[in-house]
Amino acid sequence: MDHVDRILEQWNRERPDLDVAPMGLFGRLARLRIHVAREIEKTLLAHGLNSASFDVLATLRRSGPPYRLSPGDLIATTMVSSGTMTNRLDQLEKAALIERSHNPDDRRGVIIALTPKGLALVDEAVTAHVENEHRLLESLDAGERAALDSLLRKFLKDFE
């Protein structure tokens, strides 16, 4: 029995007329999100990053050489506002993890690129991040992981 089961028992006792089964699923998803986010933040913090800065650096890294994107592309990929992105970029530039340069294709535009320091850091951090994710999934065997992934993918498609 977990925390969510106790909540469901209470609702079943207080409102037996309601089918509260969906609360179990959404409650567990919400609680897992909190626990997983906490574990991810700890791993990233060990590399001097938080999830927001890691998101930007990882997006640039995933883009492939020369690891450059426009701010608009970063905003679209990370789904944050331009003001939020500007703040993130300012912090990363101050730490010498990214650099801004003029876009050669649009003189009014800017290109964001990983610096060598940023590339090295994100490579270290993503390695630790993936190792941490494997650790977080250790209680599930390969078949359970595949089944969970398939079900979550199917469910997510309803929203995206």
Segments from the language model and where they lie:
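N-terminal leader segment of winged-helix/HTH proteins
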Residues: 1-47
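C-terminal regulatory/oligomerization modules of transcriptional regulators
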Residues: 1-17, 143-160
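Canonical helix-turn-helix DNA-binding module
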Residues: 54, 66-111
